Amino acid sequence: MGKAKFERNKPHVNVGTIGHVDHGKTTTTAALTKISADKGYGTKYIAYDEVAKASESQGRRDSTKILTIATSHVEYETENRHYAHVDCPGHADYVKNMITGAAQMDGAILVVSAVDGPMPQTREHILLARQVNVPSVVVFLNKCDLVEDEELLDLVELEVRELLSKYNYPGDDAPVIRGSAINAINGDPKWVAEFMKLYEALDSYIPEPVREVDKPFLLPVEDVFSITGRGTVATGRIERGIVKVGEEVQLVGYNAEKKTIVTGVEMFRKLLDEGQAGDNVGLLLRGVDKKDIERGMVLAKPNSIKPHTKFHSEVYVLTKEEGGRHTPFFKGYRPQFYFRTTDVTGTIELPEGMEMVMPGDNVQMTIELIIPIAMEEQLRFAIREGGRTVGAGVVTKILA
């Protein structure tokens, strides 16, 4: 048989397994690669031991370069899509991964043992998925071969659906597949058939993500300089969207509201007609003084993003071993919050009844910055003091 050709024409979707410890996330991940490989979709089977070997050495640095998170990355194909799949070895790795967005998820596969039903981490992972806005959750009830009573399975399924609804996922509509990952890996046709249903659920239920280039233009300003006789240039990496010569853009953040026209796009000292997501560019701006623009502002499609100062967030506080604080902090703590390219001072409010936050905790807190920053929900940030990173967070709700 010839080598299966890798087709790049299938849509690419990022997913991950979530759920309680020992409910079978890693075995499910291995099974997803095995059955896809057996079907001849050009996937490589990654056995349990390989998936479980996920270590910090192959872990992802998150985008804010705060933490190395132990994650295992595998890929597999279905008839319609190519999936990149992340599996984390430990609960703490999940918390860090989801808060920092190190491995983005367009959808999650919630693995629940049919023997135990939902457990504390099942809840916590659903809550985290909701907080960081994972758009959809597909449920895989694992170890169904160990439950003889069909009614017990119905009960577990009902419990999981209610839990999803509690955290504002459509619990009644979510696909729930009843399977056995280990038996599917061993080739038992009954359980392989259930994995075919799981692929189908992933393909039909998880919406195809909007590509970064199709989103409204945004560039965080890293540096600014003047070119005599030509004007002011702002440099940075385009976070999303496309910018073309002659288009209007808006400065946002630091109380700037100015709109301007892009008169030139430069990359590697060459002039381009346009720059797109991922490009490091210099944008020549009409009628803008060097003093009007500074690092920390963003250039964006007009009216696509607003400046804000106050928001709810989900935060992970680094442990001492991760280079974080050695001691707890209390309400009224005033660190710097690093957004995109700059530090801004702010104060924190802790949830009612919470006196202090210990290193290693993840906590919901309200933050108020001293100057407005271009912000939207799901924006990631770092918490720093004296140039040292002590926490990682995500904006969950904008207040002001």
From Swiss-Prot:
Coiled coil: none
EC number per UniProt: 3.6.5.3
MF (Gene Ontology): GTP binding; GTPase activity; translation elongation factor activity
Segments of this protein annotated with the region G2: 66-70
Residues bound to Mg(2+): T26
Region (G4): 142-145
Residues holding GTP: 19-26, 87-91, 142-145
Any one Gene Ontology cellular component term annotated for this protein: cytosol
Residue ranges, annotated region (G3): 87-90
Catalytic activity: GTP + H2O = GDP + phosphate + H(+)
Chain segments carrying region G1: 19-26
InterPro entries, sorted: EF-Tu_GTPase (IPR050055), EFTu-like_2 (IPR004161), EFTU_2 (IPR033720), P-loop_NTPase (IPR027417), Small_GTP-bd (IPR005225), T_Tr_GTP-bd_dom (IPR000795), Transl_B-barrel_sf (IPR009000), Transl_elong_EF1A/Init_IF2_C (IPR009001)
Keyword S-adenosyl-L-methionine belongs to the record: no
Quaternary organization: Monomer.
Function, in words: GTP hydrolase that promotes the GTP-dependent binding of aminoacyl-tRNA to the A-site of ribosomes during protein biosynthesis.
Protein name: Elongation factor Tu
Gene name as annotated: tuf
